[in-house]
């Protein structure tokens, strides 16, 4: 039998590891090496191809555990092979566990898939870093399926499949205690009354510590507790929150010494479901913290190494990642600020996925467990001990797993503390159960300096910094909180400080997968008396940000500087525009930082490293927090001058918007940049500007900027250009004159704030300095002050200065080489173009459109009256043109009396700069009408500038104006000569456009042949073959009555419903009274079932009935739909009667189909039970299986499960030419050939495989309910009166016959159900576990596989016979040849 067993050895497919029957795992999940993307794809495709080659008739479901939010790479690969791939999370907030709800879902789906048949394979896969969750889910599945019962042994067995270092690499903490706790929940599913356990609200009364640890040689510790979990008061929101946090500055926090035998700490916290209980040791300053860990490993604190991180190894934060951070800010969901839980900011216990991350970011507390003992601060250790518990709380039982921490035998200075047991008391809201004794779980994890934090299924463990080191850069581990802010800062675990008056070092952001995505800088006030203000650190090498990087805006508790206090710097207009949605509805308080949702706020705290180059902040200063974006690389930000990283908005004083930027240059247009895309002009560089002049005018409101910046720039830049690309130059349209604005008064500009420092346009994105205010507007009768001369135009090869000073407001410079006549200076350019010009760039430049005058963008056109006092009026009085806009929409200005507008500005870019031109301006035309408040009063675009006095040219950039310009072209003004030609009937031939050489058409093209073409009389042709033109007068005469008739029709029903109803009535083609009479007579010969369904769909509703009843006019004037509804309203309960008619039409067909299916079930059950041949085949399979399994636990079987039939095809012989199914056919053909045709006894097997008992039950229920409704309608229609007598009579006859059919059908249905159950019992199966559909499908698959194997055996036998005959013939030939050789002498 050993040889027989070796002959039929079942080898798992290549690339897979067999766990148990039909459950496999990809073998590369157990490897410590990470495959490259190309190698990984090739490996997966190879495994999939091997599976399909060897198991072509099987189905595969792959459960993948990964860390990606989107679809995994294995999903895209295996989906091409028709395999089902289910992506599951590989962790929960960094913990190698999933929520109990998710665990239950995975287990149920896996069990359902495996129970469908033996041809279903379940393959498990995990991505890099997710091996602990894969091991846990495999152990849970094996326990759930009942194959294993011991949780510890099952989990150990799976972890032993991989190297020990694999778990240490992927998890800095030992996950086994927490995983064992949840495995016990799975194993207890048959013991507890309900599973999964319901999450019931309880009250955590107190925590009792029976062992007090010694921290830092003080003989005890100062514990505080934090509890995380879903809020039981908000059942709809299952997001984990801080349910309880011990206030740091209160009488509750006290020091407990080891002399205390028992410590009881009252909590009184309402909890529900998965809960994390965190114990933290507080330092003497009541600010710094140490995480308390109960473990059975060596006693080591969670101190981290104080060696600084090499900043040269860090890389900058990409522009795309910064855009993701900005997108996160724009979609934050804030917590409810009224709840106490919003005062606490939970932080997530980060876990690294590689040793490289651990070495690079030692500030992460969870990563310190991988540090070697040489890197740890052992001098401060003295028998330290700590605790962290995870609870799954229900009102039935409490299971808590904890581990005990012993002293470090190498560095302990006191006697060894004996291991003690911890007790936690959990009570419901009113009833308090007895305390639960916690038994320690000891799990040894080699090569780690500390052990497990118990991880929950629905929350995370916050991280507290533990090393009191000096800050470096902009991040500090802990700062003492001022007394005034202690209440709001009680739940914070770490803070951040901004260095002042020191040369800072570059900011390094940890590229960890678990860091949160927030950046906030807030510094305390320099002096205690004034309120706290925001100080933006003047850091030059710290925060270099790209030109195209957008600025993040966060609302903080601060007060904007007053006008007397100049600000440090100003944010860019683009930042203000993106900031508007954030700062519009936020409170100007630092409390907003404490309201972030857990997925952002519960971030890994970043602990600062020591640095001698920075000053530590006094303890009176308020602690600030630094949030680091999650899963983003480090971001070095460079700037040669002061850079404002955060744009701040408060409610106490409005934010100061940026002042007006300098005007555009004639051939240099700067476009707004978007995340790394740089666009600029390609012709010239920026011209040098003038020295600073008077301060700018009062700025406009920020909403004016934010509401119009995008609409105005959308007409300038249609799409962002990649770096290095040169866009096609657009045709420069002629500039329009400025719109008129009445000048009523002029107020001098207010004293502006201190202008910001100049920033090189090639490195940073702040707005360039603003120009001085424009001169006061010109009022008739008022002297005009002299206008300063314009600056010289920029030379083509001139370079722009590095730092442009604020320029004066010059008129638009001319194109180089153009000669012009001197005119008064035009007004300053529009706000939009100023904003556009404030984004300098270094990439190639494009030829710009001409600079429009002021007030031409939607920025100002939306609020024209906001700058009345700052506009410049021209000295000439031409008529005012209408107001227009360069954006996609036009906002009209309020009507006002005519005012002297400006003359048209000069054309720019009309020809090459080298060509000299003379442009003369026309005299002022006569005054025109004032502008109207309508966007439709836009005149067409002027295209030509002549010396004659034309009207003031105005234009728009819409398609309508382009079509208008085309209509005024010379071609459009020609007389249409062909308009009077009579249209002729076309000849629909196939046109030959090119005559081939030697063809008839080539000969026709010759001159001699062309002269032979006869002349065509066009007039005769038109008289004979013209298209008949209808007489317009007759057409109008014919249309008048129809229009009048249409106007007379009264439509009360919805137009779309009325049209659909008329379409339905046209299909019926029957008068409405006859239709209703057939319905009352239950006559199914006139209307079919589909038409009746349409009639039911168009039954009038109650509202429509009330509308028609309220109509008092002539009902003949109603539409067809209204008249149809009126006709249906004459029949009482018309919709119910129509449904009865539909049921009557379909009743016989439904009964016949249902009877046929029920009879098939009875027949197939009888055939299977009475088949003797099938019984002999099953007995042969049993003997064959016992022979294979002799001497094993599977041997000596008295029977086998039905799904074992499908495994016969899976076991292959060693030569891979024969399976156990082929061997069975061979044995039966040799020993029992009479049973080979047993499939002929099972004729109803295939029809029965198409039947679903659930569908039959639904059909039976529909028939039963339909008969009940018929009976109710019969009772009700008896009282309807004489109009329903025929209906009542016909319905009574139908009901009598239908009830008889229903009774016989119910009896047949009951019999078929018993037959289906008896078929499962015949094979020893439970009808609930193995329903009728599974039994029939398994038998049918076995029969087809048996027939295919038997046919293959017959073909193989034929081939062997032919081969034997050929061998025999060869032997005969050889024998004859041998005889001839012997006969020769």
UniProtKB/Swiss-Prot annotation:
Signal peptide: none annotated. Residues 345-367, 427-510, 649-989, 1362-1385 are annotated as: Disordered. The active site is at 126 (phosphocysteine intermediate). Residues 702-718, 855-867, 933-942 have a biased composition (Low complexity). Residues 9-193 form the Phosphatase tensin-type domain. Residues 349-358, 448-470, 483-510 have a biased composition (Polar residues). The keyword Ribosomal protein does not apply. Residues 974-1372 form the FH2 domain. Keywords: Hydrolase, Protein phosphatase. PANTHER family: FORMIN-J, FORMIN-LIKE PROTEIN 7. Belongs to the formin-like family. Class-II subfamily. This is Formin-like protein 7. The lineage of its organism: Eukaryota, Viridiplantae, Streptophyta, Embryophyta, Tracheophyta. The gene is FH7.
